[in-house]
Curated annotation (Swiss-Prot):
Regions that span the bilayer: 25-45, 64-84, 87-107, 124-144, 172-192, 221-241
Disulfide links within the chain: none
Compositionally skewed regions (Acidic residues) per UniProt: 259-268
Taxonomy of the source species: Eukaryota, Viridiplantae, Streptophyta, Embryophyta, Tracheophyta
Known partners and oligomeric status: Part of the Tic complex.
Record-given protein name: Protein TIC 214
Any one of the GO BP annotations: protein transport
Biased composition, class Basic and acidic residues, residue ranges: 246-258, 1553-1569
Gene coding for it: TIC214
Its job: Involved in protein precursor import into chloroplasts. May be part of an intermediate translocation complex acting as a protein-conducting channel at the inner envelope.
Broad class of the protein's primary localization: plastid
Signal sequence bounds: none
Pfam families from the UniProt entry: Ycf1
Amino acid sequence: MILKSFLLGNLLSLCMKIINSVVGVGLYYGFLTTFSIGPSYLFLLRARVMEEGTEKEVSATTGFITGQLMMFISIYYAPLHLALDRPHTITVLVLPYLLFHFFWNNHKHFFDYGSTTRNSMRNLSIQCVFLNNLIFQLFNHFILPSSTLARLVNIYMFRCNNKMLFVTSSFVGWLIGHIFFMKWVGLVLFWIRQNHSIRSNVLIRSNKYLVSELRNSMARIFSILLFITCVYYLGRIPSPIVTKKLKETSETEERGESAEETDVEIETTSETKGTKQEQEASTEEDPSLCSEEKEDPDKLDGNQGYQENWKLEILKDKDLFWFEKPLVTLLFDYKRWNRPLRYIKNDRFEKTVRNEMSQYFFHTCPSDGKKRISFTYPPSLSTFGEIIQRKMSLYTTDKLLSPEDPYNHWVYTNEQKRHNLSNEFINRIEALDRGTLTLDVLEKSTRLCNNENEQEFFPKIYDPFLNGPYRGTTKKVYSRSIMDDSITWTEDSIEMVWINKIHDIFPNDYREFEQKMDLFNGESLSTDIGHSLTSINKFAGESAPNLNLKGLALLAEQRRLDSENQTKCLKFLSDVVTTDPNDQTIQNKYIGIEEIGKKVPRWSYKLTDHLEEQEKENEEESTEDHGIRSRKAKRVVIYTDNDQNTNTYTSTSTNSDQAEELALIRYSQQSDFRRDLIKGSMRAQRRKTVTWEMFQANVHSPLFLDRIDKTFFFSFDISGMMNLIFRNWVGKGPEFKTSDSEEKEAKEKEKTKEEKKEENERIAIAETWDTIIFAQAIRGSMLVTQSILRKYIVLPSLIIAKNLGRMLLFQFPEWYEDWKEWNREMHVKCTYNGVQLSETEFPKDWLTDGIQIKILFPFCLKPWHRSKLRSHHRDRMKKKGKKENFCFLTVWGMETELPFGSSRKRPSFFEPICKELEKKIRKVKKKCFLVLRALGERTKWFLRVLKEKTRWILKTVLFIKRIIKEFAKVNPILLFGLRKVYEPNENRKDSITNNKINHESIIRIRSVDWTNYSLTEKKMKDLADRTTTIRNKIERITKDKRKIFLTPDIKISPNETGCDDKRSESQKHIWQISKRRSARLIRKWHYFMKSFIERIYMDIFLCTINIPRRNAHLFLESTKKIIDKDIYNDERNKEGIDETNQNAIHFISTIKKSLSNISNNKSQIYCDLSSLSQAYVFYNLLQIQVINKYYLRFVLQYRGAYLFLKDRIKDHFGTRGILDAKSRPKKPPNSGMNEWKNWLRGHYQYNLSQTRWSRLVPQKWRNRVNQRRTIQNKDSKKDSYEKDQFIHYEKQNNYVVNSLPNKKEKFKKHYRYDLLSHKYIHYEDRKDSYIYGSPLQVNVNGDREIPYNYNTPKPESFYVPRGIAISDYLGEESIIDTGKNPDRKYLEWRILNFFLRKNIDIETWIDIDTGTNINKNAKTGTNDYQIIDKKDLFYLPIHQEINPSNQKQGFFFDWMGMNEEMLYRPISNLEPWFFSEFVLLYDAYKIKPWIIPIKLLIFNLNGNENISENKNINRNQKKDLRLSSNQKEYLELENRNQEEKEQLGQGNLGSDPRNRQKDLEKDYAESDIKKRRKKRQSKSNKEAELNFFLKRYLLFQLRWDDPLNQRMINNIKVYCLLLRLINPKEIAISSIQRGEMRLDVMLIQKDLTLTELIKRGILIIEPVRLSIKWDGQWIMYQTIGISLVHKNKYQTNRICREKKYVDENSFDRSIAQHGKVLVNGDENNYALLVPENIPSPRRRRELRILICLNSENGNVVDRNSVFFNGNNVRNCVQFLDEDKHFDTDINKFIQFKLFLCPNYRLEDLACMNRYWFDTNNGSRFSMSRIHMYPRFRIS
């Protein structure tokens, strides 16, 4: 058995080895390459098929194989690769060769001069066959690339060591595959030749010569096939033969731009092809000459344009004349965008950064003291190294590059570094001991800054200190005094000489190139060298130093290298290099080095797309063509404004200066295959796309098929199927009745679906017309002819015919009416989309763009016109149904409701005539028959009456007798007794007793669903009313019956009467009692059920809690329950309500759904207990002052439960005496500030600013949660908190019910933890006077505080002073804005209203509280703000509405209460591209959030001001909540915008410190005004304005409200028409009647400003989510987003100053990274400083890693005496201000603080893995255990 398994295991491992071996993989790849069939196979087949003899077959095969072998070898042999891979050489060879080939095939006889030679090898044709196969095998990869082979090889290339073995094996594999293929081809051919069925085919037999013909013309067929394949391949790839040159921008511009380099990106969407991906790698630049050899792996794929870039760069020289330029540069534009990248435009500067470099560059470099291959090696450095190697002898380079023992050297340098770092660290700590200011001890991180006064930082991408040593620009160094102090003057000069020597390494003529911007993609060589020198120490076995730009010396780097090292290295270099003695003059030139750093290679041209081209057309007569292929679009002019006011709009010849057009852009609905590609880029390399629908709006890559919702062949509507099946099962039972509303909804849905479907069909038709060539012209001309035919030929002839017919039939002709109607019909020419122009004017380019013809008031031929009087009412009814009185003309002359819709039925002319005839005939018939029928019937009737009379008399006599008998039998009193029961009782109470219940008290206990309650009450009343009415009716009926049946004959004896009276009395009594009971039962049923269920569950629960198995789960639930009860205990004691109602039962989660209405109480604690954390439960336990429920202690003491508790929680409970029954104190101490809060207090750097947080937390989700909150019962003023039930349980998904927790669940959980942490922090003693107490506590005065709104991110918006009761504060509305999140944005732009309207100078307003009165106390604060009161701002009315008496108080709290937290640095320089005021406000808000009153940050939904402002004209349109309906007309808006812009420009910008902003804004506005004056606006200026809002770099996005869009468009259509008509009134009125035009949208007021639009909800301004690329370090510190709250709530001064004016004067020094430590009154006392935070993150990481790496002695931690000096440790206490700052014991606090100070941090490990080791796998990651310092002991 063992033997078997052993053998099997061996066999397996052997197989695995074979499979994974180089040979195995090579064979596999080789076999695969067989399938990359290219055109070269054609020749091979040709030789076989044409049967030209075995020699040719053999030569073809050998040629084929030789070619393939060459290909395989060229992969690894660089010279061959270069020779074959030069795209130009190949091109030059191929063209003549192809020509020759076709010529050869078509004129054979030229060459058949001596084929009779005996040696067949000398036969020219056989040699040609060989050559054909060989050459085409080579072409197969370069001219006609099939990338399969290259990709497959690339995959394996860097994996195997034995490359030749791999090559051979893959070749062998290919050979095997090829042999199989050829054998198969041979078999097929043989079968065809042998197959008799083919031969005996009738056709072939009839034509005897067909086969021979075929064989003769085979050569021609093959050449045609070859030609087709070549053309096909070349079509897929732009040939590199002659390329289109794009217009370059001039050099001066280029220089200007490089000064203002700002962040730009090109999104690379091209496929990753092996290792060839042009994304930006860190320091990579375009390699120079000899990088070619380095890069050969990247050259496998034949992207001809791709490689030419570097080669030809050198040849480009501006000084040459055109004929001196080599042929290549004339023919090729080597600066093409060869890769199909997406071009991302950035209008702020000219050109985009070019990143056409390989993603990886492989090269060996010493790492960890050993030589390793690095894949992120800077190519420029390797190039430089090679150049140097050529100049030096091999011996010296070896000596230079290898120290004695590289590993020891590395260890030594690391030791040194570690030593220095730890010394510095210790010094800093000692300085702390000496009592230095904490801020001075912290290591500052340096940032470059351009402008000291304005805190204008370098963008992070370009800042070398923050982002590695690349991409920095520095000032030019001219004077030596500026040089860094570390290098003396003499060293300086020596350095310069060395650098000159290094220059001499390169050929002389390079120096001219240095001045050219274009060299190496516009990157000067000196830069390259300077750059390489900084990294040259890599040769010396060290990691690359960081180029330090503060000390501007070339090679100064503070910590990494001593200058001695450098001098040695440089001296050596300069000695080895031989300088040319004649070159002295040149050397002198270079004493001042011009610049350090890298010039970012940019593209040499700026591309535009089609739209921009059109915009530019009029401004400057630019001839350049657009370079980006954007989506097909058509410019549709909808309105032309001519100055001459000509009425005929036909004259297009008017000067374009005068005519101003308004155009819309229409995109075709087809898939966009252009996808913004750059012209000339290689299409074939773009990601492949497919279309699988007839009509598909967007092209999709097959990669994303699974993401697309329902493509019909993939998805399967499972739920739908289930429903169907289910319905079939249940179908036999009773059907559920759907309510009317549901039915209506279903119908609506169906209808909309249908409409959508029809619309799609219409669009598809429109698109097909658009795609077919000349279709538009044909269609347009047909439409026009149809229109003319209809109007002037068909209709008039019909009218004439009709009237002639009438005359013949002796009727009055109706000439006048008919001609009037005919005259009314208008044929309006419309654009292709249906925008109306006018009757006479054709749309521009209508033959190409298409046209529609709209018929207004279409003429309909009627046989007669009814008189007005007769049909007035009826017609009006019809009109209501018909509504729209227009149609579009189709190509066949029919009418259709919508363009491309199905043609509608026209009312028939003869139908009414036929109807009328039918009626007449019917009348005549009736008259004839009536007479006859009447006679017959009379006689019959007379006879019948006689018979019946006699019978009836007999019957009645008998009947009366029978009745008298019956009456004698019956007891008559019953008849009346019944009536008596129903007789109304005078003293009867109302049918349902109205026991008043105290609403307040019930809500206190649990907020009952009062809306439901009132509903039931109403229902009961209705019932009562109904019963009384029914009773009355019955009485009336019985009375009537009594009258009928009472006969005087009957006598009633008195005894009987008495008996019956009793009976009726008792009946009545029973009835009333039962009635009363049932009413009471109905009323109390709700509570009865509730208490009943609660009791049952309490019993069950108390039993089950003893069962150990369920202990853990139930434990949580019970604690939760107890908490709930105890928190509400106080209230319950106040309102004495029976015990049954106390018990909350909503912890049983499974039953939640079914009992949703019952358990709807207290849902502020809204979580599923199944997913609650222990922390949350225990947090709530801590809130309880006295734990008085015995069985909880039982649970806690039960051993099973004990295991589940965390130790810390156990200890905590132990101290409180909860876990131990005996030592349980009467009242546990108030926990006050718990530990968590202390921890967080200490970590100041986790103080996350609001704006940042609001970006990090998912916005939509926050809104979603907030919308769940519902207000129930608005009439009660005080209980907003209880009523504000966060989530209805119906909506909640329970883990128990849905076992799969979905995304929302996770979100909720995340949210819950946030909430919990906030509660932890903000819970404190009452005496602490935090703005709100624990969210679950009851306030002293019984009034709830304002709810925290469950918005962790921004508590500010609800800080309200404790003293004021909520009901007063909020006025009538219980809580403003339930549906919308109050912190939906950073700032609700309602604020626009109050400053744009009054034109207030915002700057001064903001400056009120900046520098001057910083030290005033809160009182003066209020006075300051009264300045603003006087200005009558917009928000005052709201305050007055809320509560005039409290206004002042409210102000103070609003404004000062908002500085809940400090925001860090303001975002440095936001350019005000749009509405400078916004930016100022925005900045101000971020810096001092309390400036802008709360009221404006909340949408006042319930405010009277908003909704009552204007009555809605079309009620049915009012879909949107905020859409009060005076919307603004579209065109009007655009004109306003221009004026708006002017106003903003001229508006007083006040004391604006940022002058640059102001100037920019002014320029912006002025240029605009000038343009207006000149009247030389570009024709699409208005269009530009539309786009103006949508530009990428705007701070705000404007979007139209959705319901508006359609209405707007309809209006535009009508409006366009009205603008063109001479007398528009008639049509305007009719279109309003038809509902085509909305008056509310039409409403034009000249003074309707932007603010009005915003107020009415037409425009919604949203701040753009500013996408700032956070660097990792920043995110690291912002991760724990819990903000610290200061005790001194209103003391804002210090922090405020701290924040904005840190170190303002000396920005040259650094800005303290941790400068924003929260200060507590005194400057000296900071939160306890964690030693870890003293060094900057980078140094910290370095020190840790070095300590970790240097652990040879096994003693990982460097036990330095400083850390173990007890006194020093105790000194930590000096950082704490005991009485002021903390309520808890200091020792305990420090323990927690240090607990948070970890041994190592995860993010450091991650960074180490990536950056320090530069390795591919994380192998060393697992080994590193970093200890920076041990835990502190606390004595």
